[in-house]
């Protein structure tokens, strides 16, 4: 056999069928080929591989006498660095010519077992020198370099065997030697390297000592390097407060919402950054895909002018209450307080259906409450659009909304003072309060218009409370004129192209995900190992590198000279539709337990009301005293009051409850019982200790009378009042104290 090619594999394509052979005239006894052995189990096939040198100089290793010299090695002649051609990938064979093998290469045995999932390193002199580690994935393998090999110069590479496609395998590396362990730990493999190099200055102690490290090279299919997250291994994460461990990220999120909600944002942000695969931001060489999150693709932030504005320390006077405020930020807060007071004084239906955060109006107070609980929360969910400040039921619906409505790098919220831009309204508001404090500038929270005078600012502020404002359909801003709205529409474009899209080749696909989700490599058909049920968006970048992206659904794309991003949506759940989705839990992809319970109750109640059989005649609601024409439409929804424990299915009764119980001005309360007030005239309250009497209109006076006189008691007399007579014999009575 030639010296240039001392290794001849029988089959490289299959992992378990790699068998190494070599022919040497003079071999040491321990260098002779070990015969294949087979255990009692028929499924445990053992394949033995050998790598030997062309010179018997490796036998000098046996001359070591002291165990303390574990980091020493024999001196060998310098050899040209390189990797045997058999171990090179296809790309390496094209770039570099074949090189000579490394002298005194390690000898190891590869054992493939289908019934175990451990990696073992054995030494003949130390039978207990073993280390077990869990195999991360079915499609990955672990290669441990033998710890009894000699030290090599730093420029030399250790040949490694790349194996793919093996399931439930483990490798046992054996080295029958009588000497102590002289270990060499290779450097951690980089992304751009295929074979790790040796660091001769480091050594591997025995397994019995605490600081044990093993030189492992994780080799997975399709990538040069991989991590335990790529391999699909369960990585335990602990709650920072109670130290309860979880295998998946979503159960940890659900636990932290109830255990430590104040720590969830910061703690999960660190976990996502640390667990994100290193190759997720890079284009795959084979498929040409790029994986990006919604936050990276659509959202952005631009600092604008960095020069500091001079402070004027101007005072502002409110012409409504003649109060003088020290600076502009306090005056803005004062105006917001005036707005809240005016809403409380004005008893209108809009006050109970308008969101106090984004100033949107909803048909019912229940829908408003659902919007606040799902969108304006301190926790970030993967189903919320930060530009619109709206929440969606699933991540797939969110991605469809982002594709149809927004552009990559869209920043519609602009500070008119310094041109600071952001995709979220809260960033601009926080920037204005921090950077432009103690100046003449006053920011409108409705349209972000900046004024420098108090009186025009207050007039502009109050005009937003009137009807007929022009709302932007793509964000939360609202304007007083259609001209301002048209000028604002120009901001809904790509302001800064994401850095990840720069330099992409034509035809490269970009996968947009709403969240990372639990990565599972057991689904090779899903892009980049995304979990079933995880929604993603595939975007093909334009051939020309332009900074503006156009939506393909817009018919007026000819107005812009830039090209478009053609987007197609798909879901990874189509890959594995037969498997249940019970284990995969998403933060907001599924409705909350409370909403799901209310939905089920509503569906059951609606079905029962539709199928109800009642007697003919007039039916009245005992809560609102109105006629019931259709039971299903009258009791359409189950409403729970957010201020007290009041629950009802009657929408009219809930409106009256909000007006009468949670209003600051009882004299202006709106009552829906005016049509039926005649039936309430039969109620009389009599004090049993004195001559104090009160009818149905004097209930508050009777309550005040009883509260001032602790020993007095009251009796309620209810009379049946007909339409013709106003009084009759008392029918029922009860006493109150």
Swiss-Prot record:
Principal subcellular localisation of the protein: nucleus
Annotated spans, Disordered: 57-137, 176-223, 535-602
Keywords attached to this entry: DNA-binding, Isopeptide bond, Metal-binding, Nucleus, Phosphoprotein, Repeat, Transcription, Transcription regulation, Ubl conjugation, Zinc, Zinc-finger
Signal sequence annotation: none
Protein name: Zinc finger protein 280C
Crosslink feature (Glycyl lysine isopeptide (Lys-Gly) (interchain with G-Cter in SUMO2)) location: 5, 10, 14, 33, 55, 75, 113, 126, 167, 174, 180, 187, 273, 522, 564, 574
Gene3D superfamilies recorded: Classic Zinc Finger (3.30.160.60)
GO biological process: regulation of DNA-templated transcription
Disulfide bonds, paired cysteine numbers: none
Function: May function as a transcription factor.
Residues modified to Phosphothreonine: 223, 540
Basic residues composition bias: residue spans: 580-602
PROSITE patterns: ZINC_FINGER_C2H2_1 (PS00028)
InterPro entries assigned to the protein according to its UniProt record, in alphabetical order: DUF4195 (IPR025243), Snail/Krueppel_Znf (IPR050527), Znf_C2H2_sf (IPR036236), Znf_C2H2_type (IPR013087)
Name of the gene encoding the protein in the UniProt record: ZNF280C
Zinc finger C2H2-type: from-to: 316-338, 353-376, 383-406, 413-436, 470-492
PTM sites of type Phosphoserine: 80, 227
GO cellular-component term (any): nucleus
Biased composition (Polar residues): 57-66, 112-123, 176-185, 211-223, 535-579
